[in-house]
Amino acid sequence: MNEVSVIKEGWLHKRGEYIKTWRPRYFLLKSDGSFIGYKERPEAPDQTLPPLNNFSVAECQLMKTERPRPNTFVIRCLQWTTVIERTFHVDSPDEREEWMRAIQMVANSLKQRAPGEDPMDYKCGSPSDSSTTEEMEVAVSKARAKVTMNDFDYLKLLGKGTFGKVILVREKATGRYYAMKILRKEVIIAKDEVAHTVTESRVLQNTRHPFLTALKYAFQTHDRLCFVMEYANGGELFFHLSRERVFTEERARFYGAEIVSALEYLHSRDVVYRDIKLENLMLDKDGHIKITDFGLCKEGISDGATMKTFCGTPEYLAPEVLEDNDYGRAVDWWGLGVVMYEMMCGRLPFYNQDHERLFELILMEEIRFPRTLSPEAKSLLAGLLKKDPKQRLGGGPSDAKEVMEHRFFLSINWQDVVQKKLLPPFKPQVTSEVDTRYFDDEFTAQSITITPPDRYDSLGLLELDQRTHFPQFSYSASIRE
């Protein structure tokens, strides 16, 4: 194994991802692709002080811009199926060139790929209970039977963002519903690159867990990357909770346990989900949780001219994310705390329409509980919503185990959870995986046409907004970010 060395180091101004201010950080770029930032210059290169920022430049695209400040550069890459951006600026054009050259050199040196397969023609079986091993093998072995845009009916725009769209689709051959995320290649892959960006990210590592949305297909057209993901048809948890206003502790415990099980699985693979919030939780036909990956930007991607722009839902942001410190797995336990608080208390733990005030509450305000909550539930929520990630329940080295061993989950057999042996407290009234009663009527009735074989790009639905004007995302019961 080659020894990791520091390729370049120095002060950069990094723009906050949510609170759009510039913060000085001392960055080290290493030969293994890690790009780590500290508040102070480290005494020694091998010091163990935890960095505030820890990124990788593998498979990244670099861009330069003079907005919102001169000598700015942006690093963009794909994380799972989501585009993320980080923005930096330096004092001179020469300094910017030096950094960009060094980053590009490291990124290029990491590209030792096996030639051959086109990595974006990808097909896998569904991890649902009905899939047998035999079916799975057949699905994988048929991977060369190409999936195309024409294999689907396009029903409804679920979300729209700077880099792409998410559309509810129905597979013509099976009648099954999926969410298709369509991203423009040009924003992810530099002109001289082929679309292997995606394989180097975690997309094709085929995350398999009963409570995580599986990626069913990934394929490409000449200018788009398409990800086809499961779309559970038991309705959004947001919809069910807003109808009932509050869940019993028993019901919240069931959903919480399934979320914990999924997070334990992701964390064991060094994946921080980062986006636990009510609108990313759906129910399958039997009433089990499905955590989705339909987001279009998990980071604060914004038009360089606006200083205060949000991507997603600021109510769910953990204190360490707001302070732009590096966040680890504990950020997911904060997210779990927020959604479980909503389930059991019927409202968000911190809320204000004014974002500045909201951030103040998240960072400073003590958590309050309704009197009706049991001591176990209060203790769990207080632990998950600790401001300091190191003090937070789940924030220690044993991660999910801390949460699983909390007395609120005393009655839970965790092996039974992952094997779906626990009876869901609520069963959606759907008769099959193609029953659409929890979908909006407006889009189950008819299909929208967006894919003539050779010229789907020219159709309005797939045309993206101009880079100069980035739309913000709204959320309703059927539109996620």
Curated annotation (Swiss-Prot):
Which PROSITE patterns does the entry link to? Answer: AGC_KINASE_CTER, PH_DOMAIN, PROTEIN_KINASE_ATP, PROTEIN_KINASE_DOM, PROTEIN_KINASE_ST
GO cellular component term, pick one: nucleus
Ranges for domain Protein kinase come to 152-409
What residues does ATP bind to?
Answer: 158-166, 181
Q: Which residues are glycosylated?
A: 128, 131, 306, 313, 474
Changing residue 474 to A has the effect of: Impairs interaction with TTC3
Ranges where the PH domain occurs: 5-108
GO terms classed as biological process: cellular response to high light intensity; cellular response to insulin stimulus; fat cell differentiation; glucose metabolic process; glycogen biosynthetic process; insulin receptor signaling pathway; intracellular signal transduction; mammary gland epithelial cell differentiation
Q: Which UniProt keywords apply?
A: Acetylation, Apoptosis, ATP-binding, Carbohydrate metabolism, Cell membrane, Cytoplasm, Developmental protein, Diabetes mellitus, Disease variant, Disulfide bond, Endosome, Glucose metabolism, Glycogen biosynthesis, Glycogen metabolism, Glycoprotein, Kinase, Manganese, Membrane, Metal-binding, Nucleotide-binding, Nucleus, Phosphoprotein, Proto-oncogene, Serine/threonine-protein kinase, Sugar transport, Transferase, Translation regulation, Transport, Ubl conjugation
Which Cys pairs does UniProt list as disulfide-bonded? 60-77, 297-311
InterPro entries xref list: AGC-kinase_C, Akt2, Kinase-like_dom_sf, PH-like_dom_sf, PH_domain, PH_PKB, Pkinase_C, Prot_kinase_dom
Pfam families named among the record's database cross-references: PH (PF00169), Pkinase (PF00069), Pkinase_C (PF00433)
Q: Quick one: effect of changing residue 309 to A?
A: Impairs interaction with TTC3
Which positions are annotated as binding Mn(2+)? 280, 293
Q: Which residues form the active site?
A: 275 (proton acceptor)
Highest taxon above the source species? Eukaryota
Tissues in which the protein is found: Widely expressed. Expressed in myoblasts.
Provide the positions where the record notes the PTM Phosphothreonine.
309, 451
Family under the similarity heading: Belongs to the protein kinase superfamily. AGC Ser/Thr protein kinase family. RAC subfamily.
* Clinical condition linked: Defects in AKT2 are a cause of susceptibility to breast cancer (BC). AKT2 promotes metastasis of tumor cells without affecting the latency of tumor development. May play a role in glioblastoma cell survival. Type 2 diabetes mellitus: A multifactorial disorder of glucose homeostasis caused by a lack of sensitivity to insulin. Affected individuals usually have an obese body habitus and manifestations of a metabolic syndrome characterized by diabetes, insulin resistance, hypertension and hypertriglyceridemia. The disease results in long-term complications that affect the eyes, kidneys, nerves, and blood vessels.
> What is this protein called in UniProt?
RAC-beta serine/threonine-protein kinase
Q: Could you tell me which species this protein originates from?
A: Homo sapiens
Q: Which gene encodes it?
A: AKT2
